[in-house]
Design a protein with these regions (language model features):
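Expand to "…catalyze enediolate/carbanion chemistry for C-C bond making/breaking, isomerization
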Residues: 22-180
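Cationic, low-complexity basic patches in intrinsically disordered or flexible, solvent-exposed regions
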Residues: 5
Length: 180
């Protein structure tokens, strides 16, 4: 069954009532990490994903800063826990690339630290390859990352990786992730 919803309006508000939702339709938030270099991450993204990254990184930052209750338990939020300064830098890098491409931007840069410390997983191949593989599947005409055995696997969520496996050179078969 596809997602069904009803929209009702009054003079001030628009209400959306979700009456049924399919497991195949997911609300998703993510930050794509396709390189250990922030600028390279931003430059590698297509127009649509780059635009979304600005908003999604901002939403995750707000959740981590306690400014909203949305997304607080999502793996994408948990992977940035303790690294709000680096997440702000990620968000700002997406905004700067968005503007450099000539698109109109209505988002302010987030406050950040002088030298933010990246999360433990930043630059870890399983995270990078799983995100590259996801983008290859989303837009095969645009993305052509070489992902090897990661081709058929889902995201590696750093918050779900057991400490004993963190930073090891492991393939998708060693991590508890679902096939895409």
């Amino acid at each position: 069954m596809a997602g069904q919803f009803t929209v009702r309006f009054n003079k001030k508000y628009c209400f959306v009532f979700i009456t049924a939702w399919s497991a195949s339709v997911r609300l998703m938030v993510n930050t794509f990490v396709v390189s250990a270099d922030l600028e390279a991450c931003a430059k590698a993204l297509d127009y649509r994903r780059l635009g979304k990254q600005r908003v999604e990184a901002y939403q995750l930052w707000r959740a981590l800063m306690g400014m909203t209750k949305g997304w607080v338990h999502h793996p994408a939020t948990l992977m940035w826990k303790g690294h709000t300064c680096f997440l702000a830098k990620y968000c700002n890098t997406m905004i700067i690339e968005w503007q450099a491409r000539g698109y109109k931007n209505n988002m302010a840069l987030l406050p950040t630290c002088i030298n933010p410390r990246p999360p433990w997983w930043w630059g870890w191949e399983p995270v990078i390859k799983s995100h590259q593989a996801s983008l290859n599947r989303k837009m095969p005409d645009f993305y052509h990352f070489e992902v090897g055995s990661w081709k058929e696997w889902g995201y590696v969520w750093p918050s779900k990786v057991p400490e004993r496996l963190r930073l090891l050179d492991v393939g998708p078969e060693h991590l508890e992730i679902e096939r895409a």
